Amino acid sequence: MLPIRSAGLTRLAAFTPLMGRAYSDGRNYDPGPGKPSSVSALSPYIRHRLIMEQEVVAAAIAAHGAEVADKFIQEVFWRSYWKGWLAQRPAVWDAYRACVAAGLAAPPEGYEAAIAGRTGIGCFDAWVQELIETGYLHNHARMWFASIWIFTLRLPWFLGADFFLRHLLDGDAASNTLSWRWVAGLHTKGKHYVARAENIARYTGGRFAPQGELNEKPLPVQEPDPPAPRPVPNVAAPPSGPVTLLLHEDDLHPESLPLAGLHVQRVIGLCCPGARSPLGAAPLVQRFVAGALEDGLGRAVQHFGVSAERVALDELPEILRREAVVMPEA
């Protein structure tokens, strides 16, 4: 999977004919890595805004109409919903980070076997290897994985979310954290997702059939309710005069940024995938993010007609001291 916008657009064009009935009928089936699938695998491009949600939804509606493409469009909107929900409740992210740090400092029994794919549960162990080797899992497999992690292996949900965030090419703070909370029963109180052997066998085409291996009657995880939503802070007014545009891994589509009236004098790029976890990010993720940033910087040079360079995190304080910097909202 090439981390460039043109590759994302090629994948988008190829999948557009499947965004209607083919997607709604086949989206739950996971044929396995390298096999033709009814899911798009566009999420790494959308997550870094190499391609935009609007482009994807517009393609679906143009090809199939909103009603026929409804299931596919809903999946795109889930990502936006998660980001908005977490932006209004930043304490949930802070609590998650604190729990991960404490959990990794003293990992519970069974954790090392789980992340090495040595649990003895065939489907789970296979998904661990697939995730590590490809940086991707089918969405249904992600739900099964999370449910087995939480309810069968009885491991903390936040350590599973951290494992995903380290390895997923589309790893996103909001989507990943809140999806794991939803499986655990923490997002919608009393509603948790339970992986069942029959369901896994059916939707993997019989590749896996973990009969008798799963806890299929668990209770939801219990934690205090999340805080009430609070308004997202207003974005500061842009400065006058020349500005430096800071691109980062959360938004690499500089062509669409609302910068009318601003004079972009240069572009700088920053990526910090290692900040996703106390254990950093997997090499696959680091390479994808670095490549995506280079692609975004290259397009920024063409769009604004200025120079662009990648900078390190420790260079930012000095840049912010001497230049007026604008950046996309994360």
Model-derived segments and spans:
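Long, low-complexity intrinsically disordered regions
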Residues: 92-113, 183-185, 193-204
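Proline-centered flexible-loop/turn and helix-kink motifs
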Residues: 90, 119, 191-193
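Structured ligand/cofactor/substrate-binding pocket environments in proteins
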Residues: 68-81, 128-183, 188-191
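Long hydrophobic alpha-helices with heptad-repeat/coiled-coil character
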Residues: 3, 137-148, 159-163, 212-239
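C-terminal, helix-dominated tail/subdomain
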Residues: 168-224, 326
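Trp/Phe/Arg-rich N-terminal binding region typifying the photolyase-homology
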Residues: 1-107, 116, 129-133, 156, ...
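Active-site helix-to-loop segments that bind/position phosphate- or nucleotide-bearing substrates
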Residues: 117-120, 124, 134
